[in-house]
């Protein structure tokens, strides 16, 4: 039963990571590509980490070997680091793109540019 849960988590992970890869190729500009890739790969990595944690806790229950608890905790710490750094990195890339003059393809309103102009005046 645990194996099916692990395989389901891995299947969801692979699906979302593939969708993120497709987003990199299909979307028109850096902002939509960044959005698609960041959201999909974050969600995919969450499920991959859940699969590792479930595996480690199942093995811990079977063997009582503390290295599996360590593996589960390290996986959760890595997941926490990803959840903190992935959005920050995406924001930094988007901001750098905007500051370098690469604007969205179909932007109607650019509030960030308007605020920057007001600040400069």
Curated annotation (Swiss-Prot):
Note the Pfam families from the entry.
PhaG_MnhG_YufB
Which spans of this chain does the record mark as coiled coil? none
Q: Which GO terms describe its molecular function?
A: sodium:proton antiporter activity
InterPro entries for this protein: PhaG_MnhG_YufB
Signal peptide span = none
Q: Which family does it belong to?
A: Belongs to the UPF0091 family.
| NCBIfam families per UniProt | CPA3_mnhG_phaG, PRK12672.1
Q: What is this protein called?
A: UPF0091 protein PH1428
Originating organism: Pyrococcus horikoshii (strain ATCC 700860 / DSM 12428 / JCM 9974 / NBRC 100139 / OT-3)
Organism lineage reads as: Archaea, Methanobacteriati, Methanobacteriota, Thermococci, Thermococcales
């Amino acid at each position: 039963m645990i194996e099916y849960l692990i395989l389901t988590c891995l299947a969801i992970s692979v699906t979302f990571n593939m969708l993120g890869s497709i987003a990199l190729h299909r979307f028109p500009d850096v902002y939509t590509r960044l959005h698609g890739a960041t959201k999909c790969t974050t969600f995919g990595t969450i499920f991959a980490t859940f699969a590792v944690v479930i595996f480690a806790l199942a093995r811990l229950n079977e063997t009582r070997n503390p290295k599996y608890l360590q593996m589960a905790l390290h996986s959760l710490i890595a997941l926490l680091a990803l959840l903190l750094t992935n959005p920050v990195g995406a924001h930094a890339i988007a901001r750098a793109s905007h500051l370098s003059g690469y604007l969205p393809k179909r932007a109607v309103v650019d509030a960030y540019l308007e605020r920057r102009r007001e600040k400069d005046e």
